[in-house]
From Swiss-Prot:
Residue positions, PTM Phosphoserine: S422
Cellular component terms per the entry's GO annotation: nucleus
Pfam families: bZIP_1
Annotated region described as Leucine-zipper, given as residue ranges: 312-340
Location of this chain's protein in the cell: Nucleus
Protein name: Transcription factor kayak
Role, per record: Developmentally regulated transcription factor AP-1 binds and recognizes the enhancer DNA sequence: 5'-TGA[CG]TCA-3'. May play a role in the function or determination of a particular subset of cells in the developing embryo. It is able to carry out its function either independently of or in conjunction with Jra.
């Protein structure tokens, strides 16, 4: 890392002198060419020089090596010209330290090269790459503050650092870079911890590897070849520190420079020591009892967990065995079923019993009867049919279609007999024409049959069919009876039946021997897919030439359809309630309605009911 610094310094000549070290060659590698170069003059002049500066700009003094035997102190503000920094995380600021482990290692290597270029015998112990143990400084030397802590480091003017042209091992002992540059904070904190806990003498297993370096340094200063009885042996280090006396105190004060400034380090986690000094025997006894109880509880918990695991394992094994047994049984039953199925299929073509059952089928109402009915023959079906043809029951829901050959319902007696004697399902077969005579007819109400009415099956429910229909004479009289002076209008009595065709009434009146619907339904009839709607008037209405209706060829006689006089347009009003109840709707609710503009009301719902005015229903 190269830092170009233009600095104007005012130097003062002092009485302290320094030998001139060898200057570093500029052709060396950039990683090891980070040195300190300061140009000073013996007089009060100003000079501008380029050098490498590793200290922040706000420091008041710096350690410098000059070309003259004088030690200089910077008294003026330095102007820093910062160039790109290689290997640094960020640019140096007033709060960010500019010294990184890389720069510290470079400084260390630079001093090694300066002190070990010409003397290979001195540099031989450092070929392994480790730092030598710290040695004591010269007496009357000021405190050397580690550069790694990024604080001010001042070399007093009254102290001399003798650095000869031929460097030797004393340079390392005087500068003490190995202890002040690298790892000073960790060692100082551990040393302070040792000083504070020297009285207790309590050793735990939570010591880190950094504490070993402190014991190693203490043993090295004392010249001991062994590190104690163990890797983490604080006892030997503490005993060595206590036995040294004043020399050990000086060593601690010189090497661990940040002892007073560093607070006591907190111990980490881990178990507490087995024996505490501030515990009473009662507390120790309580602790021992509590630990015994905890151990017993933990043992019981482990035993219970093991027992539960064993029980579950045994249960799982039993269930697995049971599952295997069931699978084997299922396999055996499946094979047996396949064998029986094969035997039945092989025996079916040659079985005479099955052939007789198929040929001698006893049917009743288009259904295949069970085998139990074979003994009774067709008489049972005939008796059942005869009984049901004269009784009114709920057999209408069990109606079936004979022509299609499908089963839509079962007779109660037949169904119960089939369930009790026939284990096989009843299947539909093709019905022969000879079996149509045995089909049960759907009975109608006795009242309707006695009156010989011709109501269609698609009419209202049977409860409303019990009311007899009016005759042709009654209907004609009601149509021709006038209800007001304006003329004849429709005056049909209210009935709760469906409207009947006039043509059917006329035909039935002329031919009393005409067959009814029950007689017409004797033969087979296919179920219709659509609903047949018949017009109420068989013949079309005849209109006069003027289109007004009511008069044909200038005559005043009304139009007659099948003998029923009809006026066109009709002056009657169809009753909506009668239509909804299943009636004809021909009963007028009031006199004839003559629509005009004055009688129309835009809000018919606001009319009071009943009213004397003509009804506001729209005429058809």
């Amino acid at each position: 890392m190269k830092v170009k610094v233009e600095r104007t310094t005012i130097t003062k000549k002092t009485t302290t002198t320094k030998p001139k070290p060898d200057e570093e060659d500029n052709n060396d590698d950039n990683s090891s060419s980070n040195g300190v170069e300061v140009t000073a003059t013996a007089t009060a002049t100003r000079e501008t020089s380029d050098q490498l500066d590793f200290l922040p700009a706000d420091l008041s003094a710096t350690i410098s090596t000059t070309t003259t035997p004088t030690a200089t102190r910077a008294t003026t503000t330095r102007n820093l010209i910062l160039h790109p920094f290689d290997g640094m995380q960020s640019a140096p600021t007033l709060t960010t330290p500019t010294l990184t482990p890389t720069t510290l290692r470079s400084i260390d290597e630079a001093f090694y090269e300066l002190t070990g270029e010409t003397n290979n015998s001195v540099n031989a112990p450092f070929q392994a790459g480790f730092k030598p143990p710290p040695l004591a400084l010269l007496p009357n030397s000021g405190p050397v503050v580690g550069i790694g802590s990024a604080v001010e480091a001042i070399v007093p003017a009254g102290n001399t650092l003798e650095i000869g042209h031929q460097p030797n091992l004393d340079v390392l002992s005087k500068l003490n870079y190995s202890n002040s540059i690298v790892g000073s904070d960790t060692d100082d904190s551990n040393a302070s911890w040792n000083d504070q806990h020297r009285i207790n003498g309590d050793t735990t297993d939570t010591s880190s590897g950094a504490t070993d370096s402190t014991s190693y340094q203490n043993n090295s200063m004392l010249g001991n070849g062994s590190n104690g009885s163990g890797a983490n042996n604080f006892t030997g280090a503490l005993a060595a520190n206590q036995s040294t006396g004043g020399r050990g105190a000086n060593n601690n004060s010189n090497t661990n420079t940040s002892n007073s400034a560093t607070p006591a380090a907190r111990r980490g986690g881990g178990r507490r020591p087995n024996k505490a000094f501030n515990m009473t025997p009662e507390e120790e006894e309580k602790r021992r009892i509590r630990r015994e109880r905890n151990k017993a509880a933990a043992a019981r918990c482990r035993k219970r967990r093991v027992d539960q695991t064993n029980d579950l394992t045994e249960e799982v094994d039993a269930l697995v065995k049971k599952g295997d047994t069931l699978k084997a049984e299922i396999t055996t039953l499946t094979e047996l079923r396949n064998q029986l199925k094969y035997v039945i299929e092989a025996h079916l073509p040659t079985c005479p019993k099955v052939r007789d059952d198929i040929l001698s089928v006893s049917t009743c109402n288009g259904l295949i009867g069970p085998a139990a009915l074979h003994s009774t023959g067709g008489s049972s079906c005939g008796s059942v049919h005869s009984n049901h043809s004269h009784n009114n029951n709920n057999n209408n829901n069990n109606s079936n279609d004979s022509s299609s050959g499908t089963i839509t319902g079962f007779d109660a007696t037949l169904n119960s007999t089939g369930r009790s004697h026939s284990p096989l399902d009843l299947k539909p077969v093709h019905i022969d024409e000879n079996l149509l005579l045995a089909i049960k007819h759907e009975p109608l109400d006795n009242g309707l049959d006695s009156e010989s009415s011709s109501l269609d099956q698609d009419g209202p429910p049977p409860a409303k069919r019990a009311v007899p229909l009016p005759t042709i004479a009654q209907l004609t009289a009601s149509l021709t009876t006038p209800t007001n002076p304006n003329g004849g209008s429709l005056n049909t009595p209210i009935v709760s039946q469906a409207p009947v065709s006039f043509a059917a009434f006329a035909a039935n009146a002329n031919n009393p021997n005409s067959p009814t619907l029950n007689l017409l339904n004797k033969g087979p009839k296919a179920r219709p897919n659509t609903l047949a709607v018949q017009r109420p008037f068989a013949a079309p209405m005849q209109l006069n030439a003027s289109g007004t209706g009511g008069v044909v060829d200038g005559k005043g006689a009304p139009i007659q359809i099948q003998g029923v006089p009809i006026q066109t347009p009709s002056t009657g009003v169809f009753n909506f309630d009668s239509l909804m109840d299943g009636g004809t709707g021909l009963t007028p609710v009031s006199g004839p309605l003559i629509p005009n503009c004055s009688s129309q009301n835009k809000h018919p719902l606001e009319l009071p009911t009943p009213t004397t005015e003509p009804s506001k229903l729209c005429p058809l």
